[in-house]
């Protein structure tokens, strides 16, 4: 077995954490020029991943150490969400905006972030973030709020292939939210509930509308909520693995995105893959981490 799937804090998953040095001299040096990267003048870069349902940010220093991270819900306007997370992460880090020598954006809303210096695709950023966390990773499954993607990496961490499902919400976090609402269960409770399942129930449709009708029918048949939840997770896993097969099921699996926090989905995926999934301490920040790493490459 390559690795265990137990979630740990970001630093225990390979991201060293350091307290930011916030002296005025260091602020000035870091803001003046990229060459300020030295032992006496810390450099800070920020990566921001503007997704459909969450906006995530990471600040690293010149030693690739994690200074701070943040995750918030994306509102109606991605630009406003970006401003909110900028304020939050700077407060966490004890830094000022002027301390950030580079800001790189990624995700669907990356071009709507006015304070970003440049933007990079989420595929590239997920690949870089995943390889940084664990160089053994070869196949990434990312399930977000409204899309899912599979990415293949080579031993150097380069993206060699990828596929995306962004045409509908089937098998995504939004799909899970709809099913949880139909079951009258909190989305945060759905995964744990499904682990109590004792009967395999098949959900034949991944279309949100038809799947909801199936779930309502199963409720009318007095099926256990835990069994229905397990059936929903089985359907999501089947769709996800079908996506992964298109880039090649090479062992060294990693799952990112908000759905990686659902233990029911993770369990079913591992059973069907017959292998463990590597899940970082905060699976939603992998794209932002990759963006920050790209930022460091630009200035160091």
Language-model segments: residues:
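Glycine-rich phosphate-binding loop plus the immediately following alpha-helix
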Residues: 77-78, 155-199, 293, 297
């Amino acid at each position: 077995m390559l690795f265990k799937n137990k979630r740990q804090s970001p630093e225990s998953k390979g991201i060293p954490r350091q307290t930011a040095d916030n002296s005025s001299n260091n602020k000035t040096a870091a803001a003046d020029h990229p060459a300020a990267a030295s032992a006496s003048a810390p450099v800070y870069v920020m990566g921001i991943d503007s997704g459909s349902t969450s906006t995530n940010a990471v600040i690293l220093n010149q030693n690739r150490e994690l200074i701070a991270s943040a995750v918030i819900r994306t509102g109606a306007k991605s630009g406003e969400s970006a401003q909110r997370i900028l304020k939050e992460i700077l407060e966490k880090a004890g830094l000022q905006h002027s301390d950030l020598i580079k800001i790189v954006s990624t995700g669907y809303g990356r071009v709507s972030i006015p304070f970003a210096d440049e933007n990079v695709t989420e595929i590239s950023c997920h690949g870089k973030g995943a390889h940084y966390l664990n160089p053994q990773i070869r196949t990434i499954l990312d399930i977000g709020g409204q899309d899912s993607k599979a990415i293949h990496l080579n031993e150097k961490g380069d993206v060699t292939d990828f596929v995306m499902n962004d045409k509908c919400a089937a098998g995504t976090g939004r799909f899970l939210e709809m099913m949880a609402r139909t079951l009258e269960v909190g989305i945060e409770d759905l995964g744990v509930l499904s682990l109590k399942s004792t009967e395999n129930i098949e959900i034949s449709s991944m279309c949100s509308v038809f799947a909801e009708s199936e779930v309502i029918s199963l409720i009318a048949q007095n099926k256990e909520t835990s069994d229905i939840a397990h059936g929903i997770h089985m359907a999501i896993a089947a769709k996800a693995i079908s996506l992964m097969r298109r880039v090649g099921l090479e062992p060294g699996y990693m799952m990112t995105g908000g759905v990686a926090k659902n233990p029911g989905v993770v369990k079913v995926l591992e059973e069907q893959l017959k292998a463990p999934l590597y899940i970082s301490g905060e699976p939603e920040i992998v794209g932002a981490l990759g963006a920050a790493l790209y930022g460091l490459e630009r200035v160091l």
